[in-house]
Each structure stands twice: as C-alpha cells, then as structure tokens.
Amino acid sequence: VQTCALPISSHPGNVGSAARAIKTMGFNDLRLINPKIPGIAQQAEAISLASGAIDLLETSKEYQSLEESIKDCSLVIGLTSRDREFGPPAMDWQAARDLIAQTSRDQGKVALIFGPERTGLENHHLSLCTHRVWLDANPSYPSLNLAQAIMVCAYTLREKLLEGFVAGEKPDTASADLADPAAVAAMLEHWREGLIAIGYLDP
C-alpha cells in the first residue's frame, strides 16, 4: 500500500536508484511528479542504476502535479530536513512509521514524498502533505541524497511493517482518523492568508 513519489526529479540515475531501493525492500509503486525530463524512467542511466528493478521503471507513472498523484492516498508524508515556519504537523520518522503501519493495517494508501535533489520539498509540496517528517541525522550535515533517503525510509519501514508478523500479532483494527489531504491543504492556505493579513507572517 505504500507509494514512493519523487517531485520534480532531474536526474535519471536517482530515479533508477529509487526503483532499486523500493523493490529491494518489497514496495512496488513508484510515481514521478512532473520530471524535468519526460520519460525519465526510460533513460539509459535510470535503467543502468535500477539493476534488477527495471520492471518498476516500466510500471512507474508520471503525473503533471503532486495534487494529481496523491488523490488516492489517505496519508501523505513529506520528507524534509529543514524547519518550516508554516506547514503540516511535524514528527520524527519513528513516529511516522507507527502512523504508516496503522494506516496500512486499515488498508489506507500512503504516499512518501521526496523533494528534488537540489532544493528539497517546496512549501507548496508540503502544504499538500498531512505530515512533515524528518530523518534523524548529523545536525551539522543532515542532507541525504535522494536515493539514500529513500533506502533509509524503505528499509526501516519494512522492519516496522514486519514486526507484527514476526511477533505473531493480530492486526490492529482501530481506524486512523486522517483528514483528506486536499482539505488539509485548503485549511493551511486559509490560515496562511489570515496570518499574512494580520501581519504575523511575512509572505
């Protein structure tokens, strides 16, 4: 049920590495958001670095916008190492894994949003997320490249999702009460406009 989405990826090699990372960890849904190179998943460098995950490149889908790509998702996690003045609720990756596992047990679809290589997620992308998440890293140098971040998330998420099966636990049937991502984005934009109007937030 997990989805890996890459907004505005400019490097075919990173797309190939992403496909390899998520397939290695048992995931199979790669969504590419408005890539700078149309057909980026079919580029030679992407195919080379995907190694045995070429099938994920072949089944990956390109979307014109992040909004379009997450319409079927109930939980949208935006990965970023930067603090933001405004945006969705923030949590660390450990807490996010718990939430993802619960959503998965409830048959919800989850989107993991990774930003472009040079700039990371923009505020517009984060406004469409239900949660903002950071990975615990060296405070003086917290920047992972795209493929590294995806592999860390995919590996640790796989560990979390397998915990119940290893321990023989029954799935928790309690439903996670999550707001619609589009509704969250509209609410955050309404708040932002209000804060600008009263001079609290500098546009």
Which residues make up each language-model segment?
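Short, small-residue-biased leader/transition segments that mark boundaries at the very start
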Residues: V1-L6
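Short beta->alpha connector loops at strand-helix junctions that form conserved
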Residues: P7, I33-N34, T80, V133-S140
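Structured adenosyl-cofactor binding patch, chiefly the S-adenosyl-L-methionine
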Residues: N14, H125-T173
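Histidine-anchored nucleotide/phosphate-binding helix
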Residues: V15-G26
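Short internal beta-strands
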Residues: N28-K36
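S-adenosyl-L-methionine/SAH cofactor-binding core of RNA-modifying enzymes
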Residues: Q42-T119, E163
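An accessory alpha-helical subdomain
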Residues: A167-P203
